[in-house]
């Protein structure tokens, strides 16, 4: 059988790994073995964090909505409950955007939510009876 020479393929493979790891620090960007190992970890982290990003954005939206809601004398959970009772279907992403960029529209939604809540829920803590 003829001898198979793979120098070209091996060099191409190494070059592609080193090119992909060009932004890493130290040996991880210069030595093939270290670069290959780091590349595997990097892809794992990227996969994991693409999924984690969704939860992080949801937390950010909730924090923004809660801050704006408290500025309008209502808590986050009462706001969400009131919007559900008023049958207003606005997701948290849009609510957070309104809270940041359009305070008047957000205040209108807060008014809708407050109107939809039962009377004893709107009372401050300690005064409900």
From Swiss-Prot:
GO terms for cellular component: ribonucleoprotein complex; ribosome. InterPro entries: Ribosomal_bL20, RIBOSOMAL_L20_CS, Ribosomal_protein_bL20_C. Gene3D superfamilies: 6.10.160.10, Ribosomal protein L20. CDD domains: Ribosomal_L20 (cd07026). GO terms for molecular function: rRNA binding; structural constituent of ribosome. NCBIfam families: rplT_bact (TIGR01032). This is Large ribosomal subunit protein bL20. It comes from Rhodococcus erythropolis (strain PR4 / NBRC 100887). The gene is rplT.
């Amino acid at each position: 059988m003829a001898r198979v020479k793979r120098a070209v393929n091996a060099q191409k493979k190494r070059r592609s790994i080193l090119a992909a790891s060009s932004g890493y620090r130290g040996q991880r960007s210069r030595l093939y073995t270290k670069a290959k190992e780091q590349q595997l970890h990097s892809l794992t982290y990227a996969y994991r964090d693409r999924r984690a990003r969704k939860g992080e954005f949801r937390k950010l939206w909730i924090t923004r909505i809660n801050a704006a809601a408290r500025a309008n004398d209502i808590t986050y959970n009462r706001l969400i409950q009131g919007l559900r009772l008023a049958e207003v279907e606005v997701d948290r992403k849009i609510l957070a955007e309104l809270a940041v960029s359009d305070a008047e529209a957000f205040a209108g939604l807060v008014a809708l939510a407050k109107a939809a809540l039962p009377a004893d829920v709107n009372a401050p803590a300690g005064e409900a009876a």
